[in-house]
Amino acid sequence: NVNDTEHYVALRNLADKLDEKYDLQGNRIYYLAMAPRFFGTIAAHLKSEKLITDHGYNRLIIEKPFGRDLKTAKELNDDISAAFSEDQIYRIDHYLGKEAIESIAALRFGNQIVSSLWNKEHIDNIQITLAESLGVEERAGYYETAGALRDMVQNHILQIISLLTMEKPSKYTASELRDRKVEALQNIKVYSKEEALQNFVRGQYGEDADHTQSDYRHEEGTDEQSQIETFVSGKLETENKTLAGVPIYVRTGKRLARKSTQINVVFKNVDTNIFDSTDADSNLLDQNVLTLYIEPDQGYRLDLNVKDGGQTYGIMPIHLDYHKTAAEKAKIPEAYEKLIHDALDGNRTNFAHWHEVAQAWRIVDVIREAWDSEKADFPNYVSGSMGPQASQDLLKRDHRNWIFDATN
């Protein structure tokens, strides 16, 4: 019982015995995987009942969600900070523990060919897709209080964006990475209500085409008139000098055509196709695309244009692929395994700092408030599709298309 002082006393006695038995030198990690409303209470009791040692380290690992908006997140952070300092708090986001996410920095800053092209002069747009084929399953109760915007965009997607848009750190250290990521998130434009409605799309899944899968509103534990979104897509903009003007398209959803998390970096097309004598717009070359596969596959793909090998000088697209083998993937620790190991080591590189969390809420809160002001016409996409038509229209408005489409 998190409200019962005697339970904390019993826990302290047990911890002291284990400390003495295994010579732990007062080192303790507390892992909080429960409703956020209990975080402050637990932190206060850990301090008042003297579970926080005065020798060794004391660390607090906290699972998401970290609040429901900026206001509740700040209240939560204030409560926890009364007992633990910022350098003792480890806000865990399992996406940051994924090998492919951690490799973004290596790709960007470890390859001159990539880093020299990673700018607004060469990149046309960036696309981030976190697609899930399953519905809400047993998480309906949680989803009714969260939705895809809070569950996926506020943390996972914005963390990925910070890694894709941050300036180069002077060193790959926790403090340097934190500062660059905070700057990156501060450079993401916070929309007005009108801009949010114009640039973000929400969806809720209906039945599949064969009527074998139920719609969201008939899942166990959901409201039959629910306004909770199971799909989000949108356009974000960064105001940093390197990528200013490059649109960042994001989407995430449940019950989509195929499970896939990937990042598509779409490069600008060549000005003219010198290999075509007609000069027709329809004969433009395919754009170069660098794809980062996060899950379930892990790897990279680069789309290039080359001569087709025929008698005439025709051009054809090719794909340079690298995918980790089963043997390679077997050596990679699971995300939580890696992050807990990092916490034991005191390595905060892949944990979210409070300033990152706060700025992410500032970006998301406006979108949530805009949606709450208007009733959505749900359900608005078929299970097994790639989301509502409005998501496709969002890019077509800018004369672009989603690179990943599992329905083709």
What do the PLM-derived regions correspond to, one by one?
Residues 1-62, 66-408:
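Secretory/organelle targeting and membrane-embedding segments
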